[in-house]
Amino acid sequence: MLSWAITFLIIAIVAAVLGFGGIAGTATGIAKILFVVFLVMFVVSFFFGRRGRG
């Protein structure tokens, strides 16, 4: 799943350089959503992972 997020992030960066339109706008939207999802999962796993190993 992380590889898909990185792939869409790269597509979004290329789309931003070339201009937002059509598939570029869609890829940017997907990359933003995946970024937020993985950020939330990272924060949750960070806090619960620290508490479980003690």
Swiss-Prot record:
Instruction: Keyword check for Transmembrane, yes or no.
Output: yes
Q: How does it sit in the membrane?
A: Multi-pass membrane protein
Q: What is its main location?
A: membrane
One Gene Ontology cellular component: plasma membrane
Give me the segments passing through the membrane.
4-24, 29-49
User: What InterPro entries does UniProt report for this protein, alphabetically?
Assistant: DUF1328 (IPR009760)
Localization: Cell membrane
Tell me which family the UniProt entry assigns to this protein.
Answer: Belongs to the UPF0391 family.
Q: Which HAMAP family match?
A: UPF0391
By what name is this protein known? UPF0391 membrane protein PSPPH_0249
What is the organism field in this record?
Pseudomonas savastanoi pv. phaseolicola (strain 1448A / Race 6) (Pseudomonas syringae pv. phaseolicola (strain 1448A / Race 6))
